[in-house]
Amino acid sequence: MRLKEGTKCILHALGFNLLLGVCTFGYFILKGNGIFTLFADFNNQQIPFNILANQAIKTGEVFWSWNIDLGSNIIGAFSFYNLGSPFFLLTLLLPAKALPYLAGWFFILKYAVAGATSCAYLQLFVKDKKYAVLGSVLYSFSGFQAANLLFYHFHDVVALFPLMLWGIEKMLVEKKRAIFAFTVFLNALLNYFFFVGEVIFLVIYFLIRFFFKSESRLKDSVQCLTEGGLGTAMSAVLLLPSVMFVLSNPSVEEKISGMGALVFDGVKYLQILRALFFPGENMSYSSCLYWGEWSSCAAYLPM
């Protein structure tokens, strides 16, 4: 059976990003005797959290675990990190103790999937599919990815986010239903925190790409709200308990007031400017402005 050009493009992007991932991470995996390690939160939180969640699900502690601090709700504690991630679900097929050896390979898989999903979206806008593959590499190996290697679960979000952009295009341009709702479901289930930012981005995207240009503004808006709402509702099995857990935290009662709610301090703007023209740095030891800076501030325009 002959593959369609679009499918071939996605497979090429998947394979190319997979190969680049192996070349990038493979050396460090081998150097670590099979284990990919970094420092700080990656070693002390990300890997232990995945091991604990894996063990909790397999032992039936799906609602509460005494192994988290003084005891905590499993869904509330880990839905931000991994519970809704398809990558984490794959690790359930393997022993929890194998996770330190799997992390590097799952990084490679996440980069490959990010390449495939971004290519699926980008190819909708180019005649020569090679440019979609090139764009997929720029996306999956972006500065955000490199700067946030420390945060293992961020890469799950990057891998699946392009699906929502692809889904909204399929819905409003090709008039294919249900695809967008499913992509919203996947992303809402994956990470409630990032999902809020993704929704804001999608609203802006819809307004610029469709609303101000389309003659069927009302119909398009209703369709987006309907499928978006349906996808969000389907994710409620994990999303709702997560939101309830967050709202029960006393910290959410604290408010940012005054100018601090609207603008950064002056040094922060210098940090953003520095990130545009200088390569990203180790988050815990910055060369200037801040001793440690954890806001994923990296762009580096020369690249």
Regions found by a protein language model. Name each.
Residues 107, 154-157, 198, 287-292:
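Alpha-helical transmembrane segments of polytopic membrane proteins
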Residues 17, 112-124, 130-211, 223-243, ...:
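Membrane-embedded helix bundles of polyisoprenyl
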Residues 29-36, 96, 174, 210-217, ...:
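Transmembrane helix-loop junctions in multipass membrane proteins, especially transporters and channels
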Residues 3, 7-14, 97-100, 104-107, ...:
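Membrane-water interface of alpha-helical transmembrane segments
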Residues 44-53, 86, 220-221, 228-303:
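Periplasmic/ER-lumenal interhelical loops and adjacent helix-loop junctions
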Residues 61-75, 162, 187-192, 208-209, ...:
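Juxtamembrane/interfacial segments around transmembrane helices
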Residues 1-30, 223, 228:
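Start-transfer (signal-anchor) and selected internal transmembrane alpha helices
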